[in-house]
Each structure stands twice: as C-alpha cells, then as structure tokens.
C-alpha cells in the first residue's frame, strides 16, 4: 500500500546561536566532546536555555521525530515518499529503505550529523536522509496536502488508507500548539481521526493499523 507522508514543523534543529553560550548547552557539549553548535536542541537538556527562544513550546523535542520514524520505517507493508519539514523550514528527504536506530542516543548522533553535513551517510552509494533545497511550497506543488488536526473534519482512519499517490499526508511532529497559518493555508483538506488530541506516534499507529487491517494483516 502506498502512502506519502510529511512530518510537519518537526522539533529538529541544532542549538541556535542565541543560546550557544548558555551553561546548560556548554555542559552537554563538553560531556559529549562536541562543539555546542553541533549538538541537537533538546528540552530535556536545555530547558532553562530554551526559555529565551521564540516559539520554545514547539521546539527541542527530537524524540517525537524518532518515535514517528520508527513507526513509519519499520512497517513492512505501508510504503511511500517520506519527508520531514522542520521547525526551521528545512525539507529532509527520507529514504523509505532506511532503518532508523532504535536507540535514542544513536538517533541523536545521526541527526546531528545530518544537520551539520546535509546528508547521511556523508559518504556512500545510498543516501538515507538528505537536507534538500526544496521548500514546503515546492512540495505542495507536487502533491495535494492533507493535514491531520484535532480541529479537522472527523473521518475514520481507514479513509486515509484509500488515498491515491497524488496526496501527501501531513502530520505534526511538535509537542504543543497548532500548525502555522501558512501550513493551514497550504492544505487542500483537514481531517481528524479521533475525538481526542493524539500524539504523533499515536496518529501514525492508528493509521498504519487501519491500513494493515484493510490488507488483511499480511
């Protein structure tokens, strides 16, 4: 079954320059023998430093992306184009054959490498993830964007499984708040698959379970 997915406003970024000299940032970087600007922003490590950042409520949660990619990339049946749109508006193309590390610390190291060098692996025949020159506008010119939001029109998850290849399913990968106005305006349709707020991995699990059920749990 083919399903195109973009994880939107993902909380994935290197420590921004505004807080690169904060003691919490420096302490973590020294412990890992890295430059502060080469480490990933993580609210569990940089909580006090992040108080000074704009939109801090949507930032510093790379664990959300980690959990989402584990669901998407380990399903043997559901395949399609996979993109990540970060909180800093970077567009990352994900190879559907990638197997993300299950260990969170290994994932963090991989994402730091990706954001520093632009792709992983740095050298190799097959690129697993790459920071592209695309914009979100470029992406929605290729596909019709559907957003999943608790404010959308209520549908059953099975309806998502019936989408053809022209559609791109947009799922938020940030901890709090709503999609930006720009993203809401780019969407052709906005749906909800639950009467309750769901976390990113819960949304994906419901959809992937519904799609596998339609296929008879192959």
UniProtKB/Swiss-Prot annotation:
The record marks 63 as: Stabilizes Arg-61. The keyword Plastid does not apply. Its EC number is 2.1.1.-. It holds the Pfam family EMG1. It catalyses: a pseudouridine in rRNA + S-adenosyl-L-methionine = an N(1)-methylpseudouridine in rRNA + S-adenosyl-L-homocysteine + H(+). InterPro entries: Alpha/beta_knot_MTases, Rbsml_bgen_MeTrfase_EMG1/NEP1, Ribosome_NEP1_arc, tRNA_m1G_MTases_N. The record marks 61, 99, 102, 106 as: Interaction with substrate rRNA. Keywords: Methyltransferase, Ribosome biogenesis, RNA-binding, rRNA processing, rRNA-binding, S-adenosyl-L-methionine, Transferase. Gene3D superfamilies: 3.40.1280.10. It comes from the Archaea. S-adenosyl-L-methionine binds at residues 172, 177, 193-198. One of its GO terms (biological process) is rRNA base methylation. The keyword rRNA processing applies. Homodimer. PANTHER family: NEP1/MRA1 (PTHR12636), RIBOSOMAL RNA SMALL SUBUNIT METHYLTRANSFERASE NEP1 (PTHR12636:SF5). Methyltransferase involved in ribosomal biogenesis. Specifically catalyzes the N1-methylation of the pseudouridine corresponding to position 914 in M.jannaschii 16S rRNA. This is Ribosomal RNA small subunit methyltransferase Nep1. It comes from Saccharolobus solfataricus (strain ATCC 35092 / DSM 1617 / JCM 11322 / P2). The gene is nep1.
């Amino acid at each position: 079954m083919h399903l195109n997915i973009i994880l939107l406003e993902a909380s994935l970024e290197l420590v921004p320059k505004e807080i690169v000299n904060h003691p919490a940032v420096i302490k973590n970087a020294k412990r890992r023998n890295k430059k502060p600007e080469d480490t990933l922003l993580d609210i569990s490590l940089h909580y006090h430093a992040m108080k000074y950042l704009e939109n801090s409520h949507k930032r510093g949660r790379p664990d959300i992306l980690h959990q989402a990619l584990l669901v998407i990339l380990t399903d043997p049946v559901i395949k399609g184009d996979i993109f990540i749109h970060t909180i800093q508006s970077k567009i990352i193309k994900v190879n559907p054959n990638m197997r993300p590390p299950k260990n969170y610390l290994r994932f963090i190291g991989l994402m730091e490498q990706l954001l520093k060098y632009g792709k992983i692996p740095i050298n190799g025949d097959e690129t697993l993830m790459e920071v592209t020159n695309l914009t979100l506008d470029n992406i929605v010119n290729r596909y019709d964007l559907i957003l999943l939001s608790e404010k959308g029109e209520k549908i059953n998850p099975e309806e998502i499984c019936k989408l053809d290849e022209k559609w791109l399913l947009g799922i938020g990968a940030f901890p709090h708040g709503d999609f930006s106005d720009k993203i809401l305006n780019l969407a052709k349709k906005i749906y909800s698959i639950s009467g309750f707020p769901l976390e990113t991995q819960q949304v994906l699990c419901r959809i992937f379970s519904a799609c596998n059920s339609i296929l008879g749990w192959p």
